[in-house]
Amino acid sequence: MELAIGCDHGGYLLKQDILIWLEEHDIDFEDVGCFSTESVDYPVYAEKVARAVAAGECSKGIVICTTGIGVSMAANKVGGVRCALCTDCLQAEMTRRHNDANVLALGAGITGPNLAKRMVEIFLSTEFEGGRHARRVALVDSIQP
């Protein structure tokens, strides 16, 4: 599967907009929740996305909460996940190109739906450059708690 996507209640409406965009572009995805605006705990859904990516069940992931901060912190606790909180298109591009991020974090209270969909498009279509960046990503991946 290409993509796992999840959110808490604060990210639910933005996630719905992104799901429509994914369907319109025939992008295969797994929606791990949440499924309403009723209050839930963001780490649960960030972990579901992160584990799907780390296990190779999905090649990339998207996590959404109100700011994107909590879900990015939670996703990055899972080994093999490189989650980047992005607020603009340049960040979405460069986090793939130079950092090989495999999970995109979005803040629904920060980023509107049109910008978010453009960032998702860029994140999904941008390839990792490798080269000197691969060495740096390996250094990041080698850092242990």
Predicted regions and their residues:
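Short active-site oxyanion
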Residues: 2-3, 58-61, 80-82
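Glycine-rich phosphate/diphosphate-binding loop of Rossmann-like nucleotide-binding domains
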Residues: 4-24
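C-terminal binding/interaction regions
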Residues: 4-6, 10, 89-145
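A general structural signal for well-ordered alpha-helical segments in protein cores
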Residues: 15, 42, 46, 71-72, ...
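Alpha-helical structural signal in soluble globular domains
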Residues: 17, 21, 25, 52, ...
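A short beta-strand-loop structural module common to alpha/beta enzyme folds
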Residues: 28-39
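Short, structured active-site "lid" loops
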Residues: 45-63
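Mid-chain, well-packed structural core segment of small domains
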Residues: 63-64, 69-109
